[in-house]
Amino acid sequence: MIDPFQRLARRGLFLFDPETAHGMSIAALKSGLVPACQIAPDPRLRQTIAGLTFENPLGMAAGYDKNAEVPEALLKLGFGFTEIGTVTPKPQSGNPRPRIFRLVEDEAVINRLGFNNEGHEAAFRRLAELTGTGIFGVNIGANKDSEDRIADYVAGIRRFHSVARYFTANISSPNTPGLRDLQARESLAALLSAVLAVRDEMAEKSGRKIPVFLKIAPDLTEEGMDDIAAEALAHPLDGLIVSNTTLSRDGLKDQRQAKEAGGLSGVPLFEKSTAVLARMRKRVGPDLPIIGVGGVSSAETALEKIRAGADLVQLYSCMVYEGPGLPGTIVRGLSALLDREKAGSIRALRDSRLDYWAARKV
């Protein structure tokens, strides 16, 4: 439940257009105006996934801190990890404004940002200055005008290898024309081969092998899911992130804003993304890590992602509506749910509703 102070702050931010409000929230985190969340560590929430130890399973998804401006401040809100980006080799301005739209009745957001970011060098400089031991992932993408998109992903691995705790290859944004074509099997095989080869090359030189995750779309056919699963298992990929935003507008109340082009995120994405998550878990088996994203708005929805097959979960859009207290509320709520379930660990509940979600309509 959003507290009165956060409700007032949200009302103030909602007086501004979404992109301006986003910039104001980044500025507030930079300045220390947002209070840190005090959460007692719960060893039942701690997991080691892809060689990394996460104090709790909740992460901030990519898209909020595009330029690595506030990763440590985000961890202080209660997140167990955070993901910066998407970053591209060269700076780019993205698509014309307006390009973010609130669907308040639906607690959803439509964006067509188009990988607006300051480029590799700006993000690298900021990450190199961090002194903490938190888990910061780097979400890498390709420039819109790139003549060799796979080379852009390879460049991201090379540039951030010394500062990233994990990588995410984002091939599923709907806002860069042709990007989702990299999910097609032949293209995906070429991408994974190139990215993982340079990751292994850098590991030999540095002694640090950085996990690589692949972020996929929710708008996949069954054949598309088959192909991605097959290639994920055929390469030494460290995990999947399921899922990015959707092009679907099914069931929305705000039909005026629903007409805007772009990817939909927030509460309406929960069902679809969770069903795709479960289908992918069925396809890749029990061992490949999966991070579940899409519509996480509470401890209950976070746990439901885990029951559907996720090891970790991420959120972003729902914090637009619930405020910066949401991560702490969810983490405390997960501990309470483990008490209720009499579960010794969060891992013990993974896959407990896998069959239910895998059978749901996508």
From Swiss-Prot:
GO MF entries: dihydroorotate dehydrogenase (quinone) activity
Entry annotation: catalytic residues: S173
- EC number(s) per entry: 1.3.5.2
Q: According to its record, what are the GO cellular component terms?
A: cytoplasm; plasma membrane
User: Which reaction equation describes what this protein catalyses?
Assistant: (S)-dihydroorotate + a quinone = orotate + a quinol
Q: InterPro entries of this UniProt entry?
A: Aldolase_TIM (IPR013785), DHO_dehydrogenase (IPR050074), Dihydroorotate_DH_2 (IPR005719), Dihydroorotate_DH_cat (IPR005720), Dihydroorotate_DH_CS (IPR001295)
Q: Relay the cofactor remark from the entry.
A: Binds 1 FMN per subunit.
Q: How does it sit in the membrane?
A: Peripheral membrane protein
Specify which residues bind FMN according to the UniProt entry for this protein: A62, G63, Y64, D65, K66, T86, N139, N170, K215, S243, G266, G295, Y316, S317
Location in the cell reads: Cell membrane
Show the SUPFAM superfamilies listed in the entry. FMN-linked oxidoreductases
The UniProt entry, under Pfam families, shows: DHO_dh (PF01180)
Question: What does the UniProt record say this protein does?
Answer: Catalyzes the conversion of dihydroorotate to orotate with quinone as electron acceptor.
Q: What protein family does this chain belong to?
A: Belongs to the dihydroorotate dehydrogenase family. Type 2 subfamily.
Protein name, entry field: Dihydroorotate dehydrogenase (quinone)
| Gene (UniProt) | pyrD
